[in-house]
Amino acid sequence: MELNIPPKYRQDIENAKNLLKNEGCEAVFLFGSLVTGNIRDGSDIDIGIKGLPKGKFFEVYSRLYFDMENKIDLVDFDMNSDFYSMLDKIGEVVQIG
């Protein structure tokens, strides 16, 4: 799926992906308005992850919260597999890393 991400979000997405992969995430996904195209002023960046080592979620979430220009909503798909399955079924999740 080709995403048309507005420039103001691109650097945060790349930085978040790199941080999450460096912290051990096996997979990083985008979902929400940046995937559906329903972007509004002030939209956040919805990121889903799989395979983050135990005990690291709140550490990386706080780093994303304080280090990024845009608000990041981080969801652990390992803990929310039904949510991931629903997004995947309707085609509103894209793996980015």
Regions found by a protein language model. Name each.
Residues M1-F29, V35-D41, L52-G97:
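Catalytic core of pol beta-like nucleotidyltransferases
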Residues S43-I45:
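Periplasmic OmpA-like peptidoglycan-binding domain that tethers envelope proteins to the cell wall
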Residues G48-K50:
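Short hydrophobic/aromatic beta-strand micro-patches
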